[in-house]
């Protein structure tokens, strides 16, 4: 299967547009390499940095070692943004991540943690037909509501659904 990659100059133009439109100086612009070879990824990254990208995100199977990430980091001159999956998650040390990355995200840790917890608790619930003795703890309703800011929803419900609109 062939992979369609956006032309580098079109990508650079989009980065320049994002830089120009940036209102918050703390907004970080991350550019993806989307390249088939390491050399192409480095060349694309250089162009993206010149266009104003703050971080480079190597979305490419051509990087298979820390040495390749080091070459990208050195070649483009800015820190990398890493999505820590697969070998990145398993093989890189914290020190290596800090060496090359300005931003590192573990995008599936939460999902996989919740999935395993659900699997364990639902298996026990199916077996025992009771929530007592579940292998993983559950949050209580009050803490859950507090965590998601449900009091704001309840205030809006009170205001609009019950007709308690503020006087103008």
What are these regions (language model features)?
Residues 1-82, 90-106, 112-113, 119, ...:
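Alpha/beta enzyme core
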Residues 125-168:
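Flexible C-terminal active-site loop/helix
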Residues 111-114, 151:
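Substrate-binding cleft of secreted/luminal carbohydrate-active enzymes
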Residues 85:
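Histidine-centered beta-alpha loop that forms part of the nucleotide-sugar donor binding/catalytic region
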């Amino acid at each position: 299967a062939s992979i369609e990659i956006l032309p580098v100059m079109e990508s650079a133009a989009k980065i320049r547009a994002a830089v120009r439109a940036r209102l918050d100086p703390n907004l970080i612009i991350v550019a993806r390499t989307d390249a088939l070879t390491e050399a192409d990824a480095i060349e694309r990254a250089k162009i993206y940095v010149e266009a104003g990208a703050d971080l480079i995100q190597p979305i490419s199977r051509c990087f298979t070692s820390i040495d390749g990430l080091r070459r990208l980091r050195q070649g483009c001159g800015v820190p990398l943004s890493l999505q820590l999956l697969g070998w990145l998650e398993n093989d890189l040390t914290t020190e290596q991540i800090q060496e090359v990355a300005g931003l590192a995200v573990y995008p599936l840790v939460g999902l996989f943690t919740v999935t395993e917890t659900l699997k364990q608790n639902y298996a026990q619930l199916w077996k025992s037909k009771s929530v007592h003795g579940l292998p993983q703890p559950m949050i209580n309703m009050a803490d859950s509501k507090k965590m998601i800011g449900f009091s704001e929803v309840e205030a809006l419900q009170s205001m609009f659904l019950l007709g308690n609109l503020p006087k103008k």
